[in-house]
Regions:
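Short, contiguous alpha-helical
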Residues: 9-13, 17-34, 38, 42-57, ...
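A short, structured beta-strand-centered segment in the mid-to-C-terminal lobe
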Residues: 153-164
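Hydrophobic, helix-prone linear segments
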Residues: 1-2, 118
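Short, contiguous, pocket-lining structural segments
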Residues: 105-109, 160, 181, 185-188
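Catalytic cores of extracellular degradative/oxidative enzymes
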Residues: 163-180
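Short, charged, surface-exposed hinge/linker loops at domain edges
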Residues: 2-6, 50-103
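Hydrophobic, well-structured mid-protein blocks that either form specific transmembrane helices
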Residues: 94-129
Length: 203
């Protein structure tokens, strides 16, 4: 039955200092719900999917909302990077390279998410001080894809956020759809830009 189709959810635990969890909708890279624990994150996925699809449609994307139930299929914990930052989890789905069309589509989603963040920072530029983790993560993802991120002395605050994303975008284009880690990098770039917008708006 259409109403009982299963959809995969991938859960990452310990995504921040508070120990919260993120539940990622497997069919929609970058669509993720945050919860105080895995169960609450997974429970929030259906509503998040509706919001995510609506957001994309509002920006001209033609996208059908997945119908059915969402189930946790895999769980992994965030770790720690060599630079002391939070090393984000990888899932089995991340090993599947996107098609050329998917790659182009998801790059577009990442650009839309970054535009949302830029708009939020225009209103509250001092919020950039709370997003050092985002710049560090983009720089780390770029490095994993083979493109060095900005040096520690290169920029700070808002400038560093944009410099790190420029490095990640360059890395993604260089890697192309067949690059190892591309799906994971896009998933995190979209999800965490949108999460950053919510963190800014909550203040």
């Amino acid at each position: 039955m259409a109403g009982t189709l299963p959809h995969a959810v991938f859960v990452e635990t310990g995504v921040d200092a508070a120990g919260r969890a993120m539940a990622f909708a497997g069919e929609l890279p970058g669509c993720a719900a945050v919860g105080d624990d895995p169960a609450s994150a997974v429970a929030a996925v259906p509503a998040r999917v509706t919001d995510f699809v609506g957001w994309l449609r509002a920006h001209g994307e033609s996208l059908a909302e997945p119908v059915g139930n969402w189930y946790e299929v895999e769980r992994a914990a965030a770790g720690e990077r060599a630079d002391g930052g939070r090393g984000r989890a990888s899932f089995s789905l991340d090993e599947l390279p996107p098609s050329a069309d998917e790659f182009a589509t998801w790059l577009g989603w990442a650009e839309l998410a970054r535009e949302e963040l830029a708009a939020a920072l225009d209103v509250q530029p001092t919020a950039a001080e709370r997003l050092a983790w985002l710049a560090a993560q983009d720089a780390a993802l770029a490095s994993e894809l083979g493109t060095p991120g900005p040096s520690d002395e290169a920029a700070a605050g808002l400038d560093r956020i944009y410099a790190a994303r420029d490095a990640l975008t360059t890395a993604l284009f260089r890697a192309g759809p067949g690059g190892a880690g591309v799906r994971r990098a896009l998933r995190l770039a979209i999800a965490d830009d949108l999460r950053a917008v919510e963190l800014i708006s909550a203040r």
